[in-house]
A protein has these predicted regions:
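Activation segment
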Residues: 679-680
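Active-site-facing substrate-recognition patch
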Residues: 233, 509-601, 610-611, 615, ...
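Active-site signature of alpha/beta-hydrolase-fold catalytic machinery across serine-
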Residues: 61-62, 66, 201, 616, ...
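Arginine/glycine-rich "motif VI" loop of SF2 helicases in the C-terminal RecA-like domain
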Residues: 348-355, 595, 624-625, 692-696
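PRPP-dependent phosphoribosyltransferase catalytic core
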Residues: 493, 508, 512-514, 685-708
Length: 708
């Protein structure tokens, strides 16, 4: 019998493809064998841009099998999401490919993975881009991997490009990895969502040579692009007046949608609230966000794949590469910020079925949310210079650095990654150091990217308004010159979805969105590094100085009261007394609080931005609850100096010893402490400490809004 290595390449590749899909009669899609041939025989660098469901994973698994039979080392597959890794490992196992992963959830398996790699018992190693940039991995494991690397695969390669809809700084480090590799090691990058600008940028990164050269002067990159039309998808847009109407539509028509699917939301709060509402009214759904426990996320993915739930209500945490070929529908409560991002998410549906339904329910709050995420991902010149100045030759951990620069942990980590890619800082064992390399803020570049983001947002609004074919619109957004009318969307074939909403569903949705009361966990420990800013505290906050669990009327991001609260706290909004409706909603929160002991008095926070609002709220709660109103705390020394959005250490330092309760006759009992907006919780923590020291046995914080 002829061995696979002795077969002509196409025959051997087709046999491997048959093993992968379980069908010996299978043949290649257009472009698949061309890519495999380039990798296995040509040992080239290739970029494959093909629609979801085309079979990009088949290319790299088949190429891996053939390269391994040639005696090559393992493939390293860079994959951005845990859900995607799990699906890729399952697909590899079905094909007889030995695949293992190193990620944040399986640290207990790392030693075994290293042993298997050393014993050449691994065909594919899946790693996240963040893991590739981990100092221990980079210094202890990566050199040996690069020395015997059989192939490098970069999945969801649009993440490399800062022009891409989901740019990730850690992906940009792949250019350095590619430059370290021998020129005859094949490299494959795959994506379904790249327009011409992103394709050019990614190809430049793939063509990197040692020393950083690339592009036209680097290694030639083969680009294989195919038509991106998804003929199985039936697209539509339904504009409804508010969040209650959108929830009511889902409640009325979720069971009419085919099979099981995904309901996407733009925020974590919206995902949690929507899932709770649908569950409360009999629908079998689960929430899935970046804040969901990893084990629960894996369980939810499995339940969706087995059709044990009608839907997962998810943020973009469930996105790239999630593999359920028969996914029946995708509904968006709120639009993504670009047609390209939308195409990527709806691409989860209908991969192995003749038809799947895709419906967009846009919201009036979408643009506000887009703006927040767009600005949060852009580096700030002043912050970047502050970070570089704080670092030296000795490693500083992220928590310690947080105590030196007024930046919160998440944006600080993102900024460090950007500066790392730019060569200004470097992550090493023990923290971060400054490299000493000159760094200049590329204002022109970031202005161009910001302008592109705004243009993408306008393009998304055009998608919502277009009277032309929706699939063709998405294809044109991806620079696909094969775009043609699909004949299936609501504009081509007429409305395929019901537009009406049952009155009972509307009433139930309105009641759900009228739900009030969000728990506010008190701070239990002081932040690390407070002493660096002359705040003489560390460790746990003494029990006698802590606040109790508090309440907020709602989060600013909530689907219900969140809209009203966002208007109140919008930049430039005038201060005014609280409205009767808002006051009654607050009374409902207090009525359902269930505190261990009823408060005996009310104290207000001395708000500088909304004094009328806070004073009227405190007085109103005092009158309705028949509790004495003691007045407001006083500032000391001009009030807090910490800026909203700063990190814990600076927020604490900004309000430390600023509150004075000496002028108030604080009783020896629980006190209700009233504020307008809770953000970091440090303001209320320090204020509660002052009230406790003045004689209160407990402090119950209450605010209109909770940020986050």
């Amino acid at each position: 019998m002829t061995s696979p290595t002795a077969m002509p390449l196409r025959e051997a590749a087709r046999a491997a493809l048959g093993e992968l899909v379980g069908r010996p009669d299978v043949d290649f899609h257009d472009g698949q064998f061309e890519a495999i041939e380039a990798l296995v025989e040509g040992r080239r660098r290739a970029l494959v841009v093909q629609r979801t469901g085309w079979g990009k994973s088949a290319v790299y698994f088949v190429a891996t099998l053939l390269r391994r039979r040639q005696g090559a080392g393992p493939t390293v597959l860079v994959s951005p999401l845990l859900a995607l890794m799990r699906d890729q490992i399952a697909a590899a196992e079905r094909a007889g490919v030995r695949a293992v992963a190193i990620n944040s959830t399986n640290a207990h398996e790392w030693a075994e993975v290293q042993e298997r790699l050393a014993g050449d018992d691994v065909d594919v190693l899946l790693v996240s881009p963040e893991r590739l940039n981990n100092p221990a991995f980079r210094e202890e494991q990566l050199p040996a991997l690069v020395a015997r690397l059989g192939m490098l695969v970069v999945d969801e390669a649009h993440c490399i490009s800062d022009w891409g809809h989901d740019f990730r700084p850690d992906y940009r480090r792949l250019r350095d990895l590619i430059a370290q590799m021998p020129a005859d090691v094949p490299v494959l990058a795959t994506t379904a969502t790249a327009n011409s600008r992103v394709v050019a940028d990614v190809a430049e990164q793939l063509g990197a040579l040692p020393g950083g050269a690339g592009g036209a002067e680097g290694v030639p990159v083969l680009t294989i692009r195919g038509p991106l039309a998804r003929t199985s998808l039936r697209l539509g847009v339904l504009r409804l007046k508010d969040s209650a109407s959108r929830l009511a539509w889902l409640l009325s028509h979720l069971d009419d949608l085919p099979g099981s699917g995904i309901i996407y939301t733009l925020t974590v709060a919206a995902a949690v609230d929507t899932a709770r509402f649908l569950r409360d009214h009999g629908h079998d759904v689960r929430a899935y966000t970046g804040q969901t426990d990893p084990e629960e996320r894996a369980e939810s993915e499995g339940m969706l794949k087995r059709n044990e739930v009608k839907a997962l209500v998810a943020t973009s945490a469930l996105g790239m590469g999630f593999d359920k070929p028969d996914l029946g529908f995708v509904v968006h409560l709120g639009a993504p910020s670009s047609p390209v991002a939308y195409y990527q998410q709806v691409g989860r549906a209908g991969r192995a079925s003749e038809s799947a339904d895709v419906l967009l329910l846009p919201g009036v709050e979408d643009r506000e949310i887009w703006h927040y995420f767009a600005t949060a991902s852009m580096p700030d010149r002043e912050r970047a210079e502050r970070v570089i100045a704080a670092l030296g030759d000795s490693p500083i951990s992220t928590p310690a650095l947080e105590a030196l620069v007024d930046i919160r942990r998440t944006p600080l980590e993102l900024l460090l990654k950007v500066l790392d890619v730019d060569g200004a800082v470097r992550r090493v064992q023990g923290g971060w150091i400054a490299t000493g390399h000159p760094w200049t803020y590329d204002a022109e570049r970031y202005e161009r990217i910001a302008a592109e983001r705004v243009a993408e947002q306008e393009h998304m609004l055009e998608y919502e308004r277009t009277d032309g074919c929706r699939m063709a619109f998405l294809q044109r957004a991806l620079d696909d010159d094969t775009a043609a009318p699909c004949g299936r969307c609501d504009n081509c074939a007429g409305l395929w979805f019901p537009a009406e909403v049952a009155q009972t569903a509307s009433a139930q949705a309105a009641a759900s969105l009228d739900r009030v009361g969000v728990p506010v966990e008190p701070r239990r420990a002081w932040p690390t590094g407070a002493d660096r800013l002359d705040v003489p505290v560390r460790g746990r906050i003494p029990a006698g100085e802590q606040a109790d669990e508090g309440r907020a009327l709602a989060r600013l991001t909530d689907l219900g009261w969140g809209g009203t609260l966002r208007e109140i706290f919008a930049a430039g909004a005038p201060d005014a007394p609280i409205s009767p409706a808002l006051l009654q909603a607050c009374v409902r929160v207090l009525a359902g609080w269930g505190w261990a002991e009823r408060p005996v008095a009310v104290i207000a926070m001395p708000s500088r931005s909304h004094p009328q609002l806070v004073d009227s709220l405190a007085r109103g709660l005092s009158e309705i609850g028949r509790l004495p109103y003691l007045g407001a705390l006083e500032w000391r020394g001009g009030g807090p100096s910490g800026q909203a959005g700063g990190n814990s250490v600076f927020r604490l330092a900004g309000v430390w010893n600023r509150f004075d309760a000496a002028h108030l006759e604080v009783p020896a009992g629980p006190v209700l402490l009233v504020d307008d907006l809770i953000d970091s919780r440090w303001t209320l923590t320090v204020a509660a400490r002052a009230v406790r020291q003045a004689g209160a046995t407990a402090v119950l914080p209450f605010a209109l809004a909770l940020r986050g």
